[in-house]
């Protein structure tokens, strides 16, 4: 997936922008350039996730943190997310590091 995102932001969208400019559509070219920036961010996310998978840190941390179940909202504090949610029985894959971005 990361390679696909790389191709999009390095090759495809810049080429689309160039063509749009050449054909007299500067607003569309501008949009393609902005989409290219989004695709670059997607690549970064995929590569970070791959690194976390390879390092075994998707569901573990060196310090105690809060993990939140994305299904029911249950919050667990520990170095590792539970194998199964104690509240709704969903698997560990439903846990993420709790965000307080509200």
Which stretches of residues belong to each language-model region?
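Non-heme di-metal
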Residues: 1-102
């Amino acid at each position: 997936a990361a390679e696909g995102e790389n191709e999009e932001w390095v090759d495809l969208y810049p080429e689309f922008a160039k063509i749009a400019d050449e054909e007299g559509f500067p607003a569309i070219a501008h949009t393609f350039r902005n989409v290219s920036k989004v695709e670059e961010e997607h690549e970064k996310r995929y590569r970070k996730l791959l690194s976390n998978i390879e390092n075994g840190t998707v569901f573990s941390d060196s310090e105690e943190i809060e993990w939140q179940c994305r299904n029911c909202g249950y919050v667990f504090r520990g170095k590792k997310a539970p194998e199964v949610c104690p509240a709704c029985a969903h698997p560990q894959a439903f846990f993420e590091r709790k965000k307080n971005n509200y």
